[in-house]
Amino acid sequence: GFRGIGGTIGFALTFLIGRWDPRIGMAIGFAAMVAAGLWLMHFDLNVSEEALLWNAVLQGISVGIIWVPLTVLTFKTLDREHLPEAMAMFHLLRNIGSSLFISLSVAEIIRSGAMNYSRMTEMISPYNRTLQLPGSMGGFGMETVPELAKLSGEITRQAAMIGYVNGFGLFTAASAVAIVLVAFSGGRGKGA
């Protein structure tokens, strides 16, 4: 998809960045990931498909830029006889790390969505004076079961969006922390 197109562009950009210390390329990639995350955090329920696609391209570019220097730094100090085991461990740890972060993100989306649904439904009451003002309910009502179901559906959409924005915040924060970790990681190592 579009993230793959971005990844291809990111891999191509590593030819330009490859002359520098690999940590610089990784920092640039994670900075692009932070930019993508901040962009995601500003989406709302009216986000366009085009904005989502361009964000996927930016995420792909960032992963493409990160991947090559990360792989180079991982394997450049190893002797050839250890490469097969190191490659297996590298991919195992990458998969475990990805799975863990995806699980944490989904848990945050669900937790935050449920919490916000609960808080928003507390405000919906025939005794809430604000909701008694003319036009305050828009196209929603609280008199019949179908009206309440429609209102509940809208609250669910709004709460889910808040959950996703919080998940995107987690993604952005993790990328920003990665920049700091890259900056404080060791130098070029042997063979550089």
Summary of predicted features, one role per range:
Residues G1-H82, G191-A192:
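Transmembrane core module of solute transporters
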Residues H82-M89:
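Cytoplasmic loop-to-transmembrane helix junctions
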Residues M89, R94-G187:
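Hydrophobic transmembrane architecture of multi-pass small-molecule transporters
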